Amino acid sequence: MLPRPYIFSHNDGPSSHLFQHVLPHNVSQQQRIEAHLNSTNNFIGPPMNAPRFIPTYQWTPVELSDVACSPNGPMGNNRKRRIQDNSDINLKRQRFSCPSPHNQSARNSNFTSQPVTRPVTGREVTCPTCSSATFIPGGCVPSLGETCHQNAFSPSSVKDKLSQQILNLFFACEQQSDDLEKKESCRAALQTDIQKIFPCAKVFLGGSSLNGFGSRSSDADLCLVIEEGPVNHRKDAVYVLSLVRKLLYKLSYIEKPQLIRAKVPIVKFRDRISGVEFDLNFNNTVGIRNTFLLRTYAFVEKRVRPLVLVIKKWANHHCINDASRGTLSSYTLVLMVLHYLQTLPEPVIPCLQRDYPTCFDPKMDIHLVPSGPSDIPAFVSRNQSSLGDLFLGFLRYYATVFKWDKQVISVRMARTLPKSNCKEWKDKFICVEEPFNRTNTARAVHERMKFEAIKAAFIESHRLLQLRKDLNFILPKSKQMARPQTAPR
């Protein structure tokens, strides 16, 4: 194991177990020195020879166009000479990089293990997750980046005004393929730069960017993975992310990097080229798992995505959709919608973790997670309620039916659980179970005033919508296209 005082002299250094995989025993003394210089000086230098413990980002269709990359990184000084691919010097350089992914057996036949690289200027990279790909036979979940509306609503099939308003808002605001391309381009560039200090690290895109519930104005969630396993967030994550933040300050395409020391620490930053806001966490792989669980729910029934999008817009307008300010995160809101749709007398959606347990196994290798639900068929519900009726029913459920003081929302079980089952949950205002690690996703709501504001929004919006049947009375047109509010930095 690497002696911590040698490489990491920081007072708040990481736990020793974390970096034994970053710098293995077979790394030479010279390579350790290079890694140390990369992390303490200007983060510049050739990658050390370390085994690829975290395989290359594999969530890309097989058909990939090659992307040329300049030999100089974004911080390069342009003094390196250009070298032919077949030169002796280049062959020598390859011996000091991670093993080629082509020497590894494919983990999934539908995804390639080719890395995505980035040009220095302009960053015009073809988004690998948006390349053309066919649907897997029998599966309801489209390939990553698929732009067509599978089983989409026909505008003429929607009769009532409220449903039409919801559908119009959905089509106007849903994330487009070019939005995803911008996020993927920054992800690929960032992974290349982070590998200068953590050669075997991978950066994964997740959250609403991939789960089917993103809008054109959605931020992007990134997960930095160095080794898969439990992390001491107070020590390991904060330390690693502090190194990453120092790196981001030196990258010309990144603006305003800020370390947020939350229960799950993140680095917030902005991509100068696309203007997209990013949240980067460290080793929070449960976020990758729930991304593809939610993606399956998004496409298993055609009414789910429009309903979730309008509810997120509504919650943002009423200032109850910001965990950093003590209200509900977007993830919690999505789980609340799914729970409501699961627990209707005639469910609109199934309970995926109960019906397809092997597809969402919490122990599944993280690189197989995207293909887990690939063969799950579309759900045919007997409940044919309109979008308008479902939205009104959602507001009614949380305004008058759900018992906040006694019940826990569980999408994993497709029912409510009693708070008394868990002593840690008894004094929480809102309890929403995370489907994989079973923590409370609504833990940010810890002030009674914020809790009462959330309940009041449901009660008043339900009253108005029941009376008017018009979306504009609870979500004005001027706010429907607004970017989600975020806490000031």
Swiss-Prot record:
It is found in: Cytoplasm. Keywords: ATP-binding, Cytoplasm, Magnesium, Manganese, Metal-binding, mRNA processing, Nucleotide-binding, Transferase. Residues 100-116 have a biased composition (Polar residues). It catalyses: RNA(n) + ATP = RNA(n)-3'-adenine ribonucleotide + diphosphate. GO terms for cellular component: cytoplasm. CDD domains: NT_PAP_TUTase. GO terms for biological process: mRNA 3'-end processing; negative regulation of miRNA catabolic process; RNA 3'-end processing. Its main location: cytoplasm. Transmembrane segments: none annotated. Its EC number is 2.7.7.19. SUPFAM superfamilies: Nucleotidyltransferase, PAP/OAS1 substrate-binding domain. Mg(2+) binds at residues 219, 221. Residues 93-118 are annotated as: Disordered. GO terms for molecular function: ATP binding; metal ion binding; poly(A) RNA polymerase activity. Residues 386-440 form the PAP-associated domain. InterPro entries: MTPAP-like_central (IPR054708), NT_sf (IPR043519), PAP_assoc (IPR002058). Belongs to the DNA polymerase type-B-like family. GLD2 subfamily. Cytoplasmic poly(A) RNA polymerase that adds successive AMP monomers to the 3'-end of specific RNAs, forming a poly(A) tail. In contrast to the canonical nuclear poly(A) RNA polymerase, it only adds poly(A) to selected cytoplasmic mRNAs. May not play a role in replication-dependent histone mRNA degradation. This is Poly(A) RNA polymerase GLD2. It comes from Danio rerio.
